[in-house]
């Protein structure tokens, strides 16, 4: 687990990525290849029990590939 002040937000980010990935019909392996990330790292990012951070640039890349706004991935309602 990462040492962070924002565990809830990072967990929700991962869940949002997983939701939009599935809506696009992509597997973790496919998305990981498209964003130049290992499948293991993506899996950790999406896992509800994991707290994994990513760079802002990577967030923009994921949003672009999933055809959503970065704000959609950062929606914590």
Residue ranges and their predicted role:
Residues 1-12:
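A detector for short, charged/polar N-terminal pre-domain segments
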Residues 15-34:
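Short basic helix-loop element that most often maps to the first helix and adjoining turn
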Residues 17, 31-32, 42-45, 73:
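Conserved hydrophobic/aromatic packing and binding residues within compact polymer-binding modules
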Residues 49-64:
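Short, basic-rich loop-to-helix N-cap that marks the start of a DNA-contacting helix
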